[in-house]
Amino acid sequence: MSLVVRFSPTNLTAEKYDESIRRHAEAGVALPPDGMDLHVCFGSNGNLRVSEIWDSRDQLDAYGQQLMPILADVGIELSGEPEIFEVHNIIKR
């Protein structure tokens, strides 16, 4: 069953977000990683949020092991554990 994951960083700016994306390539981390169906970054600068849709919790957790060192290096802090919800339905165009 698919999952919606919502991250609420405490200090996410466009510059930090863009740097984290650049560092994925530098670290050899594929984007999108296996199991990630959708990634959306939204909000106002300094208060950006990220939501994702994942195929499974195992795939999310595997990516998290690669992601957390990148976020730490860039200075992105999370306000706690992400919110995780089971998907009831997805409609795509």
Regions found by a protein language model. Name each.
Residues 1-51, 55-69, 76-93:
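Short S/T/G/P-rich N-terminal loop/turn motif that feeds into the first structured element of a domain
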